[in-house]
Structure formats: structure tokens, C-alpha cells
A protein has these predicted regions:
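Non-heme iron-sulfur electron-transfer modules
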Residues: 114-139
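FNR/FR-type flavoprotein reductase catalytic core
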Residues: 1-102
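Local cysteine-cluster metal-coordination motifs and their immediate loop/turn environment
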Residues: 73-75, 98-123
């Protein structure tokens, strides 16, 4: 890897996870960390807004970028669209999908996402693999 850029969003300052790890990443020379919260209280001194608002502020070479994300599906869809809109190939953008999994082998259908099963075909997919599925409201 060259530089690692972490865009981290949480609903509120109290909802942030891995605070010690975030602090250690912030101290590293090879990691750029940007943290934002959707809603802030009076003691918060950081950025306020959705994680997608961080995208225009980072510089990267689209052909040398690999993106990995987890979180709410709407956020991942928006960030993935923002990255591909800036030239990152959809096959280099990875999303960790979450579904209610029961059997874990694709039999029960609880985790079915269009034609794929998150339990056996994922849970990590490239944006290229599921971009069209993410646009369908019913799934």
C-alpha cells in the first residue's frame, strides 16, 4: 500500500467505535484519517455531516485506489458512487453487505440479495458486482 486514507463516520460522537485505534491511526505518518459525525453535541470539535461530504476533500489517484467500506447500505452506495464518479474502477470498490443470515449456506433465502446470497456469495462484493442491485428499492 501507499497511503491509507480512512474516512470514518458515526451517527454521533458517543456512537464512535474503536476510539483508541482511531487515535493511533491519526498519529501515524502513513495514514490520513478524517472523522465526521451526523449529529454533534456541544462538546464535539470535529466535522459534522455525512461521510460522503468527506470525499471532495481527499486527493487520490483513481487508478491506484482500492476502497473498502462497511456500514449502512445507503452510505456505502453513495460513497461507492462518489468514488466511481471520480474515476475509481467499480471493481476496485468493495462493500461489506449485511443481511439477516439464518442457515449460512444459501438455502433459507433470508440473506438473498437479488440473485446472490450474502452468506455464501459474500458478504464482500465489488461495486461492479452489485451496483445494479443497489439501485433496486425492493431488495
Amino acid at each position: 500500500f501507499g497511503r491509507v486514507r480512512v474516512l470514518y463516520g458515526a451517527r454521533s460522537p458517543a456512537d464512535r467505535l474503536f476510539i483508541d485505534e482511531l487515535e493511533s491511526w491519526k498519529a501515524r505518518d502513513d495514514v490520513d484519517l478524517a472523522v465526521t459525525v451526523d449529529y454533534a453535541d456541544g462538546g464535539w470539535r470535529g466535522r459534522v455531516g455525512f461521510v460522503t461530504a468527506l470525499l471532495p476533500h481527499i486527493r487520490f489517484d483513481p487508478d491506484a485506489t482500492l476502497a473498502m467500506m462497511c456500514g449502512p447500505e445507503a452510505m456505502m452506495r453513495a460513497v461507492a458512487s462518489g468514488l466511481t464518479g471520480r474515476g475509481v474502477p467499480a471493481g476496485d470498490v468493495y462493500l461489506s453487505m449485511e443481511r439477516n443470515m439464518k442457515c449460512g449456506v444459501g438455502t433459507c433465502g433470508h440473506c438473498q440479495f437479488g440473485p446472490v446470497f450474502v452468506c455464501k456469495d459474500g458478504p464482500v462484493f465489488t461495486f461492479a458486482e452489485i451496483q445494479e442491485l443497489l439501485a433496486v428499492r425492493e431488495i
